[in-house]
Amino acid sequence: MPVVIGKLDTAHDSAHPQRAFLFEPGDPVRFDAAWSAQQRWQTRLLADPSAPEAVWILQHQTCYTLGRGASEKHLHFDPAEPPAPLYRIDRGGEVTHHLPGQLVAYPVLDLQRRTPDLHWYLRQLEQVVLDVLAELGLEGQRLPGLTGLWLDNRKVAAIGVGCRRWITQHGLALNVDCSMQGFEQVTPCGLTGREVGRLADWLPGLTSAEVQPLLRQALAHRFGLVWEEEAR
């Protein structure tokens, strides 16, 4: 049975806010371009621990990604001839599908400024999604032993991260008003028998444009961020 979790008072201490640059591209972004941007910022933070952090909130052009140790058995197509670009990347987790209508958040944060613990960080990313859902009047669910968020046993948010010397990259993907057809090409997150959903299934007419400010606010609150600049 799913465990329903409400809001938790575990946000970063707002008395010590962290400067962060916010990037919100207006058009869907190629995955490799967003990945390169994260890597550059991660390198910057590794070289200068006092540098500001960064967050990307965007939508991707249609693609599939495989985590570090992900199995190709969860692909329902020939990886040599994918229906959309396929990337093997340096995050945890199995296969994920990205496409327009899905909001993706990529925080490049220094966990040593908070809690240097990846399990803590994954739970905080889940809490970001729970906070967004609560603002929409929806009660999200965590499932024991699994990472991500569900509504009525349908997964609406996938989470997978990478980390180098406690500097994070990658993050979360929240299905808002995306097409569901591409998910049939894979076993999302390698979870056989688990359905995938989108927020518009519960709130017809909801758009990514309406949810994006809520996601921005939830990330700032959860990690104690003060936006240094916005690039849209």
From Swiss-Prot:
The keyword Translocase does not apply. It is found in: Cytoplasm. The active site is at C189. The keyword Endoplasmic reticulum does not apply. Catalyzes the transfer of endogenously produced octanoic acid from octanoyl-acyl-carrier-protein onto the lipoyl domains of lipoate-dependent enzymes. Lipoyl-ACP can also act as a substrate although octanoyl-ACP is likely to be the physiological substrate. InterPro entries: aa-tRNA-synth_II/BPL/LPL (IPR045864), BPL_LPL_catalytic (IPR004143), Octanoyltransferase (IPR000544), Octanoyltransferase_CS (IPR020605). GO terms for cellular component: cytoplasm. It catalyses: octanoyl-[ACP] + L-lysyl-[protein] = N(6)-octanoyl-L-lysyl-[protein] + holo-[ACP] + H(+). Its EC number is 2.3.1.181. The record marks K155 as: Lowers pKa of active site Cys. GO terms for molecular function: lipoyl(octanoyl) transferase activity. Keywords: Acyltransferase, Cytoplasm, Transferase. Belongs to the LipB family. In the reaction, the free carboxyl group of octanoic acid is attached via an amide linkage to the epsilon-amino group of a specific lysine residue of lipoyl domains of lipoate-dependent enzymes. It holds the Pfam family LplA-B_cat. It is an enzyme of class 2 (transferase). Pathway: Protein modification; protein lipoylation via endogenous pathway; protein N(6)-(lipoyl)lysine from octanoyl-[acyl-carrier-protein]: step 1/2. This is Octanoyltransferase. Substrate binds at R91, G92, G93, E94, V95, T96, H97, H98, A158, I159, G160, G171, L172, A173. It comes from the Bacteria. NCBIfam families: lipB (TIGR00214). Residues 49-227 form the BPL/LPL catalytic domain.
